[in-house]
Amino acid sequence: MALETLTSPRLSSPMPTLFQDSALGFHGSKGKRSKRSRSEFDRQSLTEDEYIALCLMLLARDGDRNRDLDLPSSSSSPPLLPPLPTPIYKCSVCDKAFSSYQALGGHKASHRKSFSLTQSAGGDELSTSSAITTSGISGGGGGSVKSHVCSICHKSFATGQALGGHKRCHYEGKNGGGVSSSVSNSEDVGSTSHVSSGHRGFDLNIPPIPEFSMVNGDEEVMSPMPAKKLRFDFPEKP
């Protein structure tokens, strides 16, 4: 069909008016009309190659025109996209909102710090109250709480350490400390208790033996503080 159309006698006929304007643009410069009159083209006839080239040129020009209509103008601004929703991070303790997870983490760290300070303050108050209670029990002596009782004098103590120290006093008194204290309390013995405190195994009810010192060979002098005067029995004269 295309060959028959190309070889038809209408090709030798003068070019229609529609193709004359296109032929002007084809032979001359683009966008400018030739100065030659239209009658000159009417008298000319197109060859087969020129006709095919003219048809292709018209088709290409028509396609470019439709493409320009479909494309939007470059001067128009692109459509604005809606802003993305900002993520919100809320604190589970005080319900405060933050824009980032890092800010929320720093805020939670302050909560943990304040909680640790409060807990340590509560522990200090508890230890102080327990110390006051212990001191009150040990100062009272005869309080209602008797956790540690001495088996010798039946005194009560708040802690086992205090009871151990108290029993140590009992043991040291048996070894020699108690002898010195009992001798010092007696009125009859007086200052001789300091001399006799180092001796062991004697009865306190028996008065001490007076001490004598030799002065100038034969003179006997009694101690300055005798416990009791000695009596001498002399035989009667006949």
UniProtKB/Swiss-Prot annotation:
Motif (Nuclear localization signal): 30-38
Subcellular location(s) of the protein: Nucleus
Low complexity bias: start-end ranges: 180-193
First and last residue of the signal peptide: none
Gene Ontology terms for molecular function: DNA-binding transcription factor activity; RNA polymerase II cis-regulatory region sequence-specific DNA binding; transcription cis-regulatory region binding; zinc ion binding
GO biological process, one term: regulation of root development
Reported induction: By cold treatment and during Pi starvation.
InterPro entries, sorted: AZF1/2/3-like, Znf_C2H2_sf, Znf_C2H2_type
Purpose of the protein: Probable transcription factor that regulates root development and phosphate (Pi) acquisition and homeostasis. Probably acts as a repressor of primary root growth and regulates Pi homeostasis through the control of root architecture.
Name this protein carries in UniProt: Zinc finger protein ZAT6
Species of origin: Arabidopsis thaliana (Mouse-ear cress)
